[in-house]
């Protein structure tokens, strides 16, 4: 009795693609992790150029350097503050 490796590979590949699509941010957006619970937010990349958001990036650099524990960009502030900042940026 043998195994059909091409079929197994195809199944595993499809599962990996499906799971990575759930975690990917849409084109033009970036996933960041915020707060003590590391809640995931997906924000427009245009926020990265805003001075208010650049202050958050500076804080992240001071606290984490380039070693982010979640593997993505981690922002060291409360979820409430982050939501307030992103709503202000979206209103501009």
From Swiss-Prot:
InterPro entries: SAUR_fam. One of its GO terms (biological process) is response to auxin. It comes from the Eukaryota. Induction: By auxin and cycloheximide. It holds the Pfam family Auxin_inducible. Belongs to the ARG7 family. This is Indole-3-acetic acid-induced protein ARG7.
